[in-house]
Amino acid sequence: MAGNSIGQYFKVTTFGESHGPAIGGIIDGVPPGLSLNAQDIQFDLNRRRPGTSRYTSPRSEPDIVEILSGVFNEKTTGTSIGLIIKNIDQRSQDYEEIKNLYRPGHADYTYEKKYGLRDYRGGGRSSARETAIRVAAGAIAKKYLYKINKINIRAYLKQIGHIHCDFKDWIYVNNNPFFCPNPEQITELDLFIRNLKKLGNSVGAKVTIIAENLPIGLGEPVFDRLDADLAHALMSINAVKGIEIGDGFSAITKLGSEYRDEITSQGFQSNHSGGILGGISTGQPIIMHIAIKPTSSIKIPGKTVTNHNQETQIITTGRHDPCIGIRIIPIAEAMVAIILMDHILRFRAQCGDRKII
């Protein structure tokens, strides 16, 4: 299987399956001398891991990361960093009844048709379990980016179902299980998700990611534009079905006189472009929004076929999230960090004699 790596100068490769003994990754390109230990990575892993609230999958994984290589005396050596996270709470028996069925909306059908077989236990390689390693790699990138330029990457829940989350302040985002920036809406979100769980259903979401304090000049036209690479990375996350950068789809109804970001001696007067022009960062905040589909693993019967093309019905009985969007926040931050880290290193390789502004 190809497609297990992302990045050029900062390259992340992941391995492992949902119900295998472990998941892991190799991170190449981390400059030497960065202070790093497991606790630097663990904070974001704890934000992503399942079983931390009644609103997410009850699968209880501690997600303790172990650094296998590339760090000595809590400093990166410049060699490949190897990471591993043991899988502890697999319940493969939950999938025995559906091993010969294709779950609608999942990768079961396409994996088996492409490869001729599939790991039916929790989706195998297609499971979001793999994203724990992305979060670990992203935590390393975040630390480096903040160290060199105080680059800050944060995300929050913008919408869940019909509920739009009004932005109040970043201080609230990590203080509730929804990553909601408005404490006044927590009760409404709580009732909505609890009712969904009673119905055995799920719902989609919208997540906003903002990267700040970026230098001007990140991005490699024409095929490695910064916005193209960010879209690639964010669309690689399980369940993400759409992305916009800046005023993306809302630009359809705008006039050129409204949309263009006019410039004065004091800088840009607006940021409709979302911090990227011509595929290159402008130095303004990069603002991204992603759309997340509702999980297809629900307790409401649905039509499907067996691997012998016999029509039947399916009810998913495993442990799943009523809204995947709640857990995507740290994953989205990680993918943005990985891309920005890669482009920082690419900028230095090509334009090393120019100061990062």
Curated annotation (Swiss-Prot):
Cross-referenced PROSITE patterns: CHORISMATE_SYNTHASE_1, CHORISMATE_SYNTHASE_2, CHORISMATE_SYNTHASE_3
* Binding-site residues for NADP(+), renumbered to this chain: R48, R54
The keyword Repressor is assigned to this record? no
Q: What class of enzyme is it?
A: lyase
The reaction(s) catalysed by this protein are:
5-O-(1-carboxyvinyl)-3-phosphoshikimate = chorismate + phosphate
Against Pfam families, the record matches this protein to:
Chorismate_synt (PF01264)
Which InterPro entries does the record cross-reference, listed alphabetically? Chorismate_synth, Chorismate_synth_AroC_sf, Chorismate_synthase_CS
Checking Gene3D superfamilies in the record gives: Chorismate synthase AroC
Q: Which family does it belong to?
A: Belongs to the chorismate synthase family.
* NCBIfam families cross-referenced by the UniProt entry: aroC, PRK05382.1
The record's annotation in HAMAP family points to: Chorismate_synth
**Name of the protein in question:** Chorismate synthase
Native organism is: Blochmanniella floridana
